[in-house]
Amino acid sequence: MRCLCFLFLLIAAPAAMAGEFRSIGDNAAPMYDAPSVKANALFVASRFYPVEVIVQLDAWTKVRDVAGDLAWVEKKNLSDTRTVVVTAALADVRQKAEDGASLVFQARQGVALEVIELGAGLWVKVLHRGGQTGFVRANQVWGL
């Protein structure tokens, strides 16, 4: 019966638009295998961690992370702030959206960066929580 109710909720819930990304808010958030705090906690996502929205229920959101894993998170733990996570071993963040532009800083794999501006091209303007801004190649990050 429990499984049947769960299945009904999944079918009845409106599916999120493909490519809708959110981020974990100001505090780390537990990620569950079902939409309940009584479910198994899979891992704790760090603050500002980007996630792709898959399904939304009233108080819960099913998300996909950078590794492709699916989990449930309480909606109250999500933020509308757009972030990306570095997937390259080391991403160059440059002053302009050009390969030859001055290097502002480098970000290691797993570092979350706030999206300031989504360009139509191959670059994304980002903000490091240390205050530095610059452009990173879109193929070096996940969350777009």
Positions of the model-derived regions?
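Positively charged n-region of N-terminal signal peptides that target proteins for export
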Residues: 1-5
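N-terminal signal peptide c-region/cleavage motif recognized by signal peptidases
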Residues: 12-14
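SH3-family beta-barrel domains
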Residues: 16-33, 41-49, 54-132, 136-144
